[in-house]
Amino acid sequence: MDRFMWTNGLLEMNETLVIQQRGVRLYDGEDKAKLDVGGVVLSTHRLLWRDQKNHECCICIPLSQVIFFEEQAAGIGKSAKIVIHLHPAPENKEPGPYQHSKYSYIKLSFKEHGQIEFYRRLTEEMTQKRWENTPVSQPIPTGTGPKAGRTRAVGIVGIERKLEEKRKETDKNISEAFEDLSKLMEKAKEMVELSRSIANKIKDKQGDITEDETIRFKSYLLSMGIANPVTRETHGSGTQYHIQLAKQLGDMLQAPLEERGGMMALTEVYCLVNRARGMELLSPEDLVNACKIFESLKLPLRLRVFDSGVMVVQLQSHSEEEMIASALDNVSDKGSLTAEEFAKLLGLSVLLAKERLLLAEKMGHLCRDDSVEGLRFYPNLF
């Protein structure tokens, strides 16, 4: 409450009334203020409160003093409140009803409702900050309250100087931001050229490039991303977009699929693709639609949906018979396997390992033991 100062309650030039509400009690933090119930007025520049009985008792606080605010729901026998957190009182603050306060926030208690609309309008004003764009052109005089103070002198020249300094600082920040952006674009071009050079070396096998180096180069390329991702801006939003996207996915995913045993969960594909696309993020719906037309475009990839609903992307050469045979061979060699153990053997995710084991079980090659220790698969000897 020590942030409030006395005022005559009149709006200044360039100051506009936003909303007012009667039946509002002030709280100094958690304590009721010594002032009675009154009306609260929100303008483009200030928050004012006038005593309901003694109209000469009027106080105000600039909106620039507000840090943030929040709603407090009504309870049994309690009115709804708006809690307003404030900056410390400035040294040159005009006199007000409180000289000192142990709280850094106030509460507006709405006895006659209206807090929802008031909160909405307060949110709008704090977002727009119109007091910065249209400063009052006259000093805000103090009123004739119980402790009326002197008239506060606000210089027009001082306000204009501050606005000019703020404008120059904003221009400087924008210029620095564009300089950083230009440098980033230059580096991006260098990275794209480097990625193309590495791709050509891998393709042509020029020079002394070992298999380990080839794998490392591929991982670097993947981390650097796609140089020219397919977007709706470049290919529209219809079928043509999904066709071009499917072709790009076919080129991008073939190498990662081969390294992961020929199959990847669609969620893993989604993360991999969006990480490579950088800022041009792909929606889950577009990814699914592109994957659905792999077969019609005769691409080397296929979208597969297991009985459990799990969706995966797999190589066309990755046949169901090979998956079943691999599961049966590994389970037979170990005697029995859980999905976690099978995943470690093949370097797959636990989800895909479980789907392979369930597929082999469905075809009659494996059987399960579902106990408190978990699901374990055995060779089907029957």
Swiss-Prot record:
InterPro entries registered for this protein in UniProt: GLUE_dom (IPR021648), PH-like_dom_sf (IPR011993), Snf8/Vps36 (IPR040608), Vps36 (IPR037855), WH-like_DNA-bd_sf (IPR036388), WH_DNA-bd_sf (IPR036390)
Pfam families on file: EAP30 (PF04157), Vps36_ESCRT-II (PF11605)
Key words, A-Z: Coiled coil, Cytoplasm, Endosome, Protein transport, Transport
Domain GLUE C-terminal, first and last residues per copy: 105-138
PROSITE patterns, sorted: GLUE
Biological-process GO terms, alphabetical: protein transport to vacuole involved in ubiquitin-dependent protein catabolic process via the multivesicular body sorting pathway
This protein's record includes keyword Zinc: no
Coiled coil: 160-193
GO molecular function: phosphatidylinositol-3-phosphate binding; ubiquitin binding
Family from the record: Belongs to the VPS36 family.
Name the UniProt record assigns to this protein: Vacuolar protein-sorting-associated protein 36
Organism listed in the record: Danio rerio (Zebrafish)
Gene name in the database record: vps36
